[in-house]
Amino acid sequence: KKNSILKKNHSWMNAIKNNFQVDDYESLIPNADLVINLTPDKEHHNVIKILQQLMKKNSCLGYSHGFNIVEFGEKIREDITVIMVAPKCPGTEVREEYNRGFGVPTLIAVHDANDIHKQGLEIAKAWSFSIGGHRAGVLESSFIAEVKSDLMGEQTILCGMLQTASLLCYEKLITDKHNPAYAAKLIQNGWETITESLKHGGITLMMDRLSNSSKIRAYNLSENIKKILAPLFQKHMDDIISGEFSAEMMKDWKNHDQKLLFWRQKIKNTSFETAPMYNKKIPEQEYYDHGILMVAILKSGIELSFEKMINAGIIAESAYYESLHELPLIANTIARKKLYEMNKVI
């Protein structure tokens, strides 16, 4: 924005420091071969409207999430190639993984209605390579499959389940007279610690961190949770496939995010979010030994979301990314600043 450039704000200073060319839309976009739109979903329509007026003929437009194309139904100029590179984690974690010499699993896709030159897939491959996605795995998908699986994962195991389980587990521990500070830390850092085993060995390795008797307890709890939550997960999947979920979300956008902001404030004021700090170190194994219910919740949530996506026609690899592989990266955000951080970056 011109105003940001004139004021030389923090983002301007950061860009200059890292040798990026900085200018406004009107100066940069007409000369660009590839324009990548990384703005929030709710801003896409207005941003794309401006971009299409400025982008040169036969250039390429990139998305990191296909909501605008699939759910809003945005139409892009026929000469513009439209691609997607969708890392399966929050943007902050893409950078973290790249900096440590790795990357995150990434879905790539080409919008069939906008691939007149048949070069979209090669551009998407190059983009995914540039952010390190090839080190973790790049899967060719479609815009619609990415959107539906992404929404299902976030609404169930990745965000919805972690948030609800954090609040319920904390309240249970407090009811049982546990130290509030310890309880909050056990849950806040427990998700990150426990899901790290998922990254290296899936549900099997996570369960192997438990004693034999604890494995049995976690398994039985998990099966009971699946029976209880199966109808709810199915409703989420049905609403996402039908478009009802997206329609309701877009209504809230038009209402200035009234529901979203109310829910965020409600979560921010919970006893879990406001719990005191626990300054002592909790040993890694203690998170497993005292987190049997958390393990059961993760197991049931992963399996349910994966099964519902498969039954809806989403390919197994994509369902896996959205139900299991992204979990540690979402859990990292909770470990930083509890649920507030997760809700802020998703």
From Swiss-Prot:
Residues holding Mg(2+) 1: 150, 154
Active site, renumbered: 65
Binding-site residues, Mg(2+) 2: 150, 322, 326
Cofactor binding note of this UniProt entry: Binds 2 magnesium ions per subunit.
UniProt pathway annotation: Amino-acid biosynthesis; L-isoleucine biosynthesis; L-isoleucine from 2-oxobutanoate: step 2/4; Amino-acid biosynthesis; L-valine biosynthesis; L-valine from pyruvate: step 2/4
One GO term (biological process): isoleucine biosynthetic process
Residue stretches making up the KARI C-terminal knotted domain: 142-286, 287-346
Obligatory cofactor(s): Mg(2+)
Keywords: Amino-acid biosynthesis, Branched-chain amino acid biosynthesis, Magnesium, Metal-binding, NADP, Oxidoreductase, Repeat
CC annotations in GO: cytosol
Disulfides per UniProt: none
Source species, domain of life: Bacteria
EC id: 1.1.1.86
Residue ranges occupied by any KARI N-terminal Rossmann domain in the UniProt entry: 1-141
Gene3D superfamilies: N-(1-d-carboxylethyl)-l-norvaline Dehydrogenase, domain 2 (1.10.1040.10), NAD(P)-binding Rossmann-like Domain (3.40.50.720)
Reaction it catalyzes: (2R)-2,3-dihydroxy-3-methylbutanoate + NADP(+) = (2S)-2-acetolactate + NADPH + H(+); (2R,3R)-2,3-dihydroxy-3-methylpentanoate + NADP(+) = (S)-2-ethyl-2-hydroxy-3-oxobutanoate + NADPH + H(+)
Alphabetized InterPro entries for the sequence: 6-PGluconate_DH-like_C_sf, 6PGD_dom2, KARI, KARI_C, KARI_N, KARI_prok, NAD(P)-bd_dom_sf
Binding locations of NADP(+): 11, 41-43, 91
GO molecular function: ketol-acid reductoisomerase activity; metal ion binding; NADP binding
Function noted in UniProt: Involved in the biosynthesis of branched-chain amino acids (BCAA). Catalyzes an alkyl-migration followed by a ketol-acid reduction of (S)-2-acetolactate (S2AL) to yield (R)-2,3-dihydroxy-isovalerate. In the isomerase reaction, S2AL is rearranged via a Mg-dependent methyl migration to produce 3-hydroxy-3-methyl-2-ketobutyrate (HMKB). In the reductase reaction, this 2-ketoacid undergoes a metal-dependent reduction by NADPH to yield (R)-2,3-dihydroxy-isovalerate.
Record family assignment: Belongs to the ketol-acid reductoisomerase family.
UniProt cross-references to PANTHER family, sorted A to Z: KETOL-ACID REDUCTOISOMERASE, MITOCHONDRIAL
Protein name, as recorded: Ketol-acid reductoisomerase (NADP(+))
Provenance organism: Buchnera aphidicola subsp. Uroleucon erigeronensis
